[in-house]
């Protein structure tokens, strides 16, 4: 409805209709043109026609609803989820002020938690917020904005010393997590403009390899926001934009403004191009290291790691591999496994933090090489070097089993980070599991109870000491 809004994230009113249908009670109050109008609903049915209930100089709409507990087994709202979304909106709409108040809990003074989100810098501050824990390569965010054409475009970007790309894209304030034409336009302009500048500067002359789009985006954090009057999303969840004209609009704005920035800031431009060259060299070294790992596997027959205690079953769907912390844990795991279905691979110490390492270093790490070899997967397909080939996956359940302490948690995080960055298909395919070790073994005589929380431990002690003799209950902490 262009008479009400120039652009809108909602397209058909499905959202409010669904909220109404799934609520026992809903009340909508509209403040507009000096008047206040209201309508109430129960189980989706209007209780009366829209009526005027007063006058007011404020503008806006207030929606109050109560989820239907006959439909939802749980309707607890996560404060952090709501806060993150409102913070996001304050960055995307600079200058506005959004207040979040949680009335569910109050302090000793009877006050509830309240938080205000406000940003004068908009996307500049958004990028700085996202990159707050990373080391910058350029001092300030590169900011591009244009509302001259039919599609307003706003982009902010920073380069950092990491080896990953983080691009956040929005259409009419909706987070398009799968990207779309606006992201494609941004990437196309970024690659073309940076390559053109690098070629003219002569910095690529000594590089004896082709530079790819991935090289230009290594260490990049960017936020893209476009306003589209008639957005075409792929799917009802609105996670990917499909408007073809948006690609050209973003491409033009980013291409022109990025080129101007590079010409006016030669020092920063040189730093960015040097980062691109390092990325290309690391990618080439990683390709050679990856090929070497896979070639060794082929030449050495099965090539399975020496510490792997494999299972006898040949059907991958029935097989499980446990990645365990250290040789001693590996020994315990071997004693408790079913040899037919369970394989055990002990990992020595903490594996490499792939988030802070160049790719070729990853393939040189023994523990990571052992994991790759044991899983049987190969990297690189016709679609691209980073695509994981799962056709040779030897175990359809990959279970991370570390200790219940801080070190165990850290090792688990490092393994998950490796899978997320380099074996994402394992996670997306539902192959990765985490074994949750117990914190306590509570024992009295031949009776044993494993406990995962303090509360469970207390209950177990009481159950085993019904005669009141708690001193006779042994507690072992893992």
UniProtKB/Swiss-Prot annotation:
SMART domains documented for this protein: TOP2c (SM00433)
PROSITE patterns named among the record's database cross-references: TOPOISOMERASE_II (PS00177), TOPRIM (PS50880)
Entry keyword NADP: no
Record-stated family: Belongs to the type II topoisomerase GyrB family.
Record gene name: gyrB
Organism of this sequence: Cytophaga aurantiaca
Miscellaneous: Few gyrases are as efficient as E.coli at forming negative supercoils. Not all organisms have 2 type II topoisomerases; in organisms with a single type II topoisomerase this enzyme also has to decatenate newly replicated chromosomes.
Residues bound to Mg(2+) 2: 403, 405
Location (main, coarse): cytoplasm
Function field: A type II topoisomerase that negatively supercoils closed circular double-stranded (ds) DNA in an ATP-dependent manner to modulate DNA topology and maintain chromosomes in an underwound state. Negative supercoiling favors strand separation, and DNA replication, transcription, recombination and repair, all of which involve strand separation. Also able to catalyze the interconversion of other topological isomers of dsDNA rings, including catenanes and knotted rings. Type II topoisomerases break and join 2 DNA strands simultaneously in an ATP-dependent manner.
Binding, Mg(2+) 1: 325, 403
GO molecular function, one term: DNA topoisomerase type II (double strand cut, ATP-hydrolyzing) activity
Cofactor note: Binds two Mg(2+) per subunit. The magnesium ions form salt bridges with both the protein and the DNA. Can also accept other divalent metal cations, such as Mn(2+) or Ca(2+).
GO-annotated cellular components: cytoplasm
Highest rank taxon of the organism: Bacteria
A Pfam family it matches: DNA_gyraseB
Signal peptide: none
Documented EC number(s): 5.6.2.2
The reaction(s) this protein catalyses: ATP-dependent breakage, passage and rejoining of double-stranded DNA
Keywords assigned: ATP-binding, Cytoplasm, DNA-binding, Isomerase, Magnesium, Metal-binding, Nucleotide-binding, Topoisomerase
GO biological process: DNA topological change
Subunit structure comment from the entry: Heterotetramer, composed of two GyrA and two GyrB chains. In the heterotetramer, GyrA contains the active site tyrosine that forms a transient covalent intermediate with DNA, while GyrB binds cofactors and catalyzes ATP hydrolysis.
Positions of the record's site feature: Interaction with DNA: 350, 353
Official protein name in the record: DNA gyrase subunit B
Subcellular location: Cytoplasm
């Amino acid at each position: 409805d262009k008479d009400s809004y120039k652009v809108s994230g909602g397209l058909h009113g499905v959202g409010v209709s669904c909220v109404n249908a799934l609520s026992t009670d809903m009340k909508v109050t509209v403040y507009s043109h000096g008047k206040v109008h209201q309508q109430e609903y129960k189980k989706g049915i209007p209780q009366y026609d829209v009526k005027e209930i007063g006058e007011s100089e404020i503008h806006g709409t207030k929606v109050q609803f109560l989820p239907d507990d006959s439909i939802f087994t749980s309707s607890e709202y996560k404060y952090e989820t709501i806060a993150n979304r409102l913070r996001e909106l304050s960055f995307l709409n600079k200058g506005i002020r959004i207040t979040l108040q949680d009335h569910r809990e109050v302090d000793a003074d009877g006050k509830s938690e309240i938080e205000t989100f406000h940003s004068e810098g908009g996307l500049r501050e958004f990028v700085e917020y996202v990159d707050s824990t990373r080391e910058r390569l350029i001092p300030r965010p590169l900011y591009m904005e244009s509302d001259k054409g039919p599609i307003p475009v706003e982009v902010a970007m920073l380069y950092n010393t990491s080896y990953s790309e983080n691009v956040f894209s929005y259409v009419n304030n909706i987070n398009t997590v799968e990207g779309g034409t606006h992201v494609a336009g941004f990437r196309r302009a970024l690659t073309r403009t940076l390559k053109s500048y690098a070629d003219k500067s002569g910095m690529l002359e000594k590089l004896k390899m082709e530079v790819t789009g991935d090289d230009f985006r290594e260490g990049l954090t960017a936020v893209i926001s476009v306003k589209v009057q008639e957005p075409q999303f792929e799917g009802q969840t609105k996670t990917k934009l499909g408007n073809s004209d948006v690609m050209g609009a973003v491409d033009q704005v980013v291409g022109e403004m990025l080129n101007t920035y590079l010409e006016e800031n030669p020092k920063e431009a040189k730093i960015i191009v040097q980062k691109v060259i390092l990325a290309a060299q690391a990618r080439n070294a990683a390709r050679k290291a990856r090929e070497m790992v896979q070639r060794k596997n082929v030449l050495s027959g099965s090539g399975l790691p020496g510490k792997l205690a494999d299972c006898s079953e040949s059907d991958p769907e029935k097989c499980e591999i446990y990645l365990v912390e250290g040789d001693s844990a590996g020994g315990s795991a071997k004693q408790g496994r079913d040899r037919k279905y369970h394989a055990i691979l002990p990992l020595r110490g903490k594996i490499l933090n792939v988030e802070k390492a160049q790719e070729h270093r990853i393939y040189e790490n023994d523990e990571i090489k052992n994991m790759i070899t044991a899983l049987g997967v190969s990297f690189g397909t016709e679609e691209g070097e980073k695509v994981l080939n799962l056709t040779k996956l030897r175990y359809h359940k990959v279970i991370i089993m570390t200790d219940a302490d801080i070190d165990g948690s850290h090792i688990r995080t490092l393994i998950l980070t490796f899978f997320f960055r380099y074996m994402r298909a394992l996670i997306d395919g539902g192959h990765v599991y985490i074994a949750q070790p117990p914190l306590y073994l509570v024992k009295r005589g031949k009776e044993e109870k494993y406990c995962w929380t303090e509360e469970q431990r207390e209950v177990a002690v009481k159950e085993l000491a019904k005669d009141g003799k708690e001193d006779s209950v042994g507690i072992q902490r893992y």
